[in-house]
C-alpha cells in the first residue's frame, strides 16, 4: 500500500500550499484568511516516481473544540492517526506560538513519526528562525517557502528517508499470475453487485442505499483457469457530499486501490450517463496510469432510444479515452460478463507487455520517416533513439535534440502510431522526451597550426585594406 503523509498545524501556516506543491495540483484552496481548509483532502505525490505516497491536507487546529473549529480539529487528528508520517507545519515569519506548543504536546502523545516543517522562510533570517524552533527538540527539520517552491526537494528527501517501504497488504498481491482489478465509480452504480455476480455469492453487501460499501475489500477469484484479485471500493462522491469521517477514509482507501491495481474498471450507470463525478474518478485512474475498462451497468433496462442517447453521450464525454474499451453489462442479471473479462484481459496484456529496445526503435524510425516533425520557427526536432521506460503503463523514453519545440500534435501522433503498431488497447501510453547535453558546450575548439596561420593571413589582409 502507498504510505500516507499528513500535514498538521495551526490555521494559515501554509499546509494547503505545501499540499498543492507536492501533488502538483490546485485541489486545496489557498487564501490568507485562516480556516479555509476544513475537511481532509487526499492526493498523490509523484514528484519522486520511485517512491509515490498519498498526502492528506487538513484544516488548521485552532484550539477550539466546539462547533466548526472543533470538527475541523477532529478531522486533523483523525488524519494524523491514519498517517505513517506527520509533517508538523509552523510559520517561520510569526515564530512559535502557544497553539504550536499545544499541537506539539498532542503529537508527542500520538507517538507518530514526525518532521518539523518551517514554512514561509522567504524574507527571514533562516538561522534565527531555526534557532527559535530548536526548543521543540526535533532532529528532523525542513525549512522552506512553499509559495515559491523553495525547499520542496529537501522536504521530499526527508519524507523519502522516513517513509516505510510499500508493504504487500491485503490489496497488493505479489503473485504475477494474478490480475488485480479495482471496481470504482460513484455510489450505487452496482460495484458490489457486480463483484457478487462474478463470485457467485453474496460476498459484498449490496443495497440501493448509496455508500453501503465503506472500505476497499479484496477477494480472490479463479475463472477459466486464470487467477484474479477483485477489489470492491467505496463509491467516490463529490467533495461537498463527503461528510462523515469514515467516508473520508473510504475515499482514501479507494485512491490506494486505484494505485495498487493493474486494471481499473470504471462503472457507469446507463440511466444517468456520464456525470462530472465520473470524470473526476476517471482523472484519478489516468493520473495513476492504470489500464482502464469502462463498464456501463443497467444496460438491459434501457430502450433502443435510451441506448442510442447513452451511446452518443459516451462518445462525446469519453472521446479523449477512446483507447479504452466500453462494455455494456447488467451486474444484476449477469449479461456482458464474458465480454467484460475479455476486455480486462486485453487491457492487462497491453499494460504489462515488455518491449525490446530494437522493436521500439524500429517503430520510431518508421514513424519518423513516415511523418517527420514540422519546422517550428526554423527549428526541427531530431528523434535519435528510444528505449522502454517501464510497464503499467507502457512508457517510452525518446532521446534527441530540440525536443522542447516538439509540438503536442506530434507527440499525439507518436502515441497513436505506437498504439496501432503494437495493438495497445485499454491502457495509457506515456512518452518521456529527453535532450542530450551538448558535450562541447562551453568548450573552446583549439585551432591547428595550419588554421592559426590561415587566420593570421586573413587578419593581415583585412588590415591592409
UniProtKB/Swiss-Prot annotation:
GO molecular function: ATP hydrolysis activity; GTP binding; ribosome binding
PROSITE patterns, per the entry: G_ENGA (PS51712)
Name of the protein in its database record: GTPase Der
Domain named EngA-type G: residues: 3-167, 179-352
Keywords: GTP-binding, Nucleotide-binding, Repeat, Ribosome biogenesis
Residues involved in GTP 1 binding: 9-16, 57-61, 119-122
Keyword Repeat on entry: yes
Known role: GTPase that plays an essential role in the late steps of ribosome biogenesis.
Family according to the record: Belongs to the TRAFAC class TrmE-Era-EngA-EngB-Septin-like GTPase superfamily. EngA (Der) GTPase family.
Residue ranges of every copy of the KH-like domain listed in the record: 353-437
InterPro entries cross-referenced by the UniProt entry: AAA+_ATPase (IPR003593), G_ENGA (IPR031166), GTP-bd (IPR006073), GTPase_Der (IPR016484), KH_dom-like (IPR032859), KH_dom-like_a/b (IPR015946), P-loop_NTPase (IPR027417), Small_GTP-bd (IPR005225)
Assembly mode: Associates with the 50S ribosomal subunit.
Binding-site residues for GTP 2, renumbered to this chain: 185-192, 232-236, 297-300
Pfam families associated with the record: KH_dom-like, MMR_HSR1
Source organism per UniProt: Xanthomonas campestris pv. campestris (strain ATCC 33913 / DSM 3586 / NCPPB 528 / LMG 568 / P 25)
Source domain of life: Bacteria
Gene3D superfamilies: 3.30.300.20, P-loop containing nucleotide triphosphate hydrolases
GO BP term (any one): ribosome biogenesis
NCBIfam families: GTPase_EngA, small_GTP
Amino acid at each position: 500500500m502507498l504510505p500516507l503523509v499528513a500535514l498538521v498545524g495551526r490555521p494559515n501556516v501554509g499546509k494547503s500550499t505545501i499540499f498543492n506543491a507536492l501533488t502538483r495540483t490546485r485541489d486545496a484552496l489557498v487564501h490568507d484568511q485562516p480556516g479555509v481548509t476544513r475537511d481532509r483532502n487526499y492526493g498523490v505525490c509523484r514528484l519522486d516516481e520511485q517512491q509515490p505516497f498519498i498526502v492528506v491536507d487538513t484544516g488548521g487546529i485552532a484550539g477550539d473544540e466546539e462547533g466548526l473549529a472543533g470538527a475541523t480539529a477532529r478531522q486533523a487528528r483523525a488524519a494524523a492517526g491514519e498517517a505513517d508520517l506527520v509533517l508538523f507545519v509552523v510559520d517561520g515569519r510569526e515564530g512559535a506560538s502557544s497553539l504550536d506548543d499545544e499541537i506539539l504536546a498532542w503529537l508527542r502523545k500520538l507517538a507518530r513519526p514526525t518532521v518539523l516543517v518551517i514554512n514561509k522562510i522567504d524574507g527571514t533570517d533562516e538561522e534565527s528562525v531555526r534557532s527559535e524552533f530548536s526548543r521543540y527538540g526535533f532532529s528532523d527539520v525542513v525549512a522552506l517557502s512553499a509559495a515559491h517552491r523553495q525547499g520542496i526537494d529537501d522536504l521530499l528527501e526527508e519524507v523519502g528517508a522516513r517513509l516505510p517501504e510499500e508493504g504487500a497488504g491485503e490489496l497488493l498481491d505479489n503473485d504475477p499470475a494474478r490480475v488485480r482489478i479495482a471496481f470504482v465509480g460513484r455510489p450505487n452504480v452496482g460495484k458490489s453487485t457486480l463483484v457478487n455476480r462474478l463470485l457467485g455469492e453474496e460476498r459484498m453487501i449490496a443495497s440501493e442505499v448509496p455508500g453501503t460499501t465503506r472500505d476497499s475489500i479484496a477477494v480472490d477469484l479463479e475463472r477459466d483457469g486464470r487467477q484474479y484479485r477483485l477489489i470492491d471500493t467505496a463509491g467516490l462522491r463529490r467533495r461537498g457530499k463527503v461528510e462523515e469521517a469514515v467516508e473520508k477514509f473510504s475515499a482514501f482507501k479507494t485512491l490506494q486501490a486505484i494505485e495498487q491495481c493493474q486494471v481499473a474498471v470504471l462503472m457507469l450507470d446507463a440511466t444517468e450517463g456520464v456525470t462530472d463525478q465520473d470524470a473526476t474518478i476517471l482523472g484519478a485512474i489516468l493520473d495513476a496510469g492504470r489500464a482502464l475498462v469502462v463498464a456501463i451497468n443497467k444496460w438491459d433496462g434501457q430502450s433502443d432510444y435510451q441506448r442510442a442517447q447513452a451511446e452518443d453521450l459516451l462518445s462525446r464525454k469519453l472521446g479523449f479515452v477512446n483507447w479504452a474499451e466500453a462494455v455494456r453489462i447488467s451486474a444484476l442479471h449477469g449479461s456482458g460478463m464474458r465480454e467484460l473479462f475479455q476486455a480486462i484481459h486485453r487491457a492487462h496484456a497491453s499494460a504489462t507487455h515488455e518491449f525490446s529496445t530494437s522493436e521500439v526503435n524500429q517503430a520510431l524510425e518508421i514513424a519518423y520517416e513516415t511523418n517527420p516533425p514540422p519546422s517550428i520557427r526554423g527549428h526541427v526536432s531530431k528523434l535519435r533513439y528510444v528505449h522502454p521506460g517501464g510497464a503499467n503503463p507502457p512508457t517510452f523514453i525518446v532521446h534527441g535534440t530540440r525536443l522542447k519545440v516538439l509540438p503536442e500534435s506530434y507527440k499525439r501522433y507518436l502515441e497513436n502510431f505506437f498504439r496501432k503498431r503494437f495493438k495497445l488497447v485499454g491502457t495509457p501510453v506515456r512518452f518521456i522526451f529527453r535532450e542530450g547535453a551538448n558535450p562541447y558546450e562551453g568548450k573552446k575548439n583549439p585551432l591547428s597550426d595550419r588554421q592559426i596561420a590561415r587566420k593570421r593571413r586573413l587578419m593581415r589582409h583585412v588590415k591592409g585594406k
